Every structure is written in C-alpha cells, then in structure tokens.
Amino acid sequence: MLLVSQRTKLIELTNEYAVYDGEGRQIGAVVQVGQSGLKKAMRLVSNLDQYLTHHLEVRDARGPVLVLTRPAKVVKSRVLVQRPDGTPLGEIVQANVFGRIRFDLVADGRLVGAIQAENWRAWDFSITDAAGTEVARITKKWEGLARTMFTTADRYVVLVHYRLPEPLASMVVASALTVDTALKQDDRGWN
C-alpha cells in the first residue's frame, strides 16, 4: 500500500506530494519541476495552467526514479512515464471525457492495463492489467471540510494486490498522480 498525499498549501504554485508506505513512513516524494516564473504567475491569477505542460519527478531517498510529463492539453489528458535517463516506459492516456472516466495504460504501442473510475464522482478507481484483471486500486480520501474548502491538497491510497512486472508496476505508481493532475487539479481551487 502507498499513500500519496499532496502537500497542503493555501496558494499552490507547484505540485508537491509525499509518498508513504503502509506503516506511515515517508518513502518518497513527488515534485513539479521545470516551472518558469511566468507559469507560476499564470497559475496564481488564472486557471490556464491546467492546459499547460507539467513535469513531475517521483523521488526516493537516492533521487529520481520516475519522470512524469503531462503534455499541454485541451480536453483529454495523457501522461508520459519514463525513467530519469529518458527511457520511455509508457503512457497513460485518457480514453473518455464523459461518464465514468477511463485511462488506458500503453507501453510500446500495446495496451498493458487501464484505470477505470467506479462512478461519475471519480474517487475510486480500479487498475487492471491487459486481461482485465484488477491488479490495484486507487481511493481518494476525503481531506476534511477545512482542507477541502481552503486548499487543493488531496490524498490517494494506492493498494497494489501483488508484485507487478514492469512497465505495469511503474504505471501503477504513476496512476494516482495522473488522476490528480489530469482530473482533480483542473476542477477546483487556484489551479
């Protein structure tokens, strides 16, 4: 189990997350990198930032382990997942806009899995492999009234059912961040 917790800020100019294991120990962090002063200013005064490119680094104690890039978007999002050296692992592609949101997990041009929202509210997601078997779940946790009203910080529990092969394992790690940057950051607060 992993808990991905967005850092609480009243005004959020960059995305930052802490990653905890099942026993509550911080095992990593995720930081938004490469954001110019102009993009930060745009994020402060408008919501146009949601349409621009975002770069996130997933880090452990030794340094970056994954790099996620969400290219500029108009309607549907996609997130490119790669190693810190630039080696591509795959991409997470939003398959639909209306109804229960779904993302396809694609590696080397083939479908290796999917992320499926369980309802229109998009708080609970099932992650499946290419055969449609659930391999993990993402659950958005309610932050409490004050945190919800005054910040954009969200928390996600990622429950992986068993050890997964690559690139699916890395795609599952990237999934909660994809849900947050592709869906949740776009629909509230200063984002």
What residues fall within each predicted segment?
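Low-complexity or membrane-interfacial segments used for flexible interactions
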Residues: 1-55, 61-64, 71-78, 84-89, ...
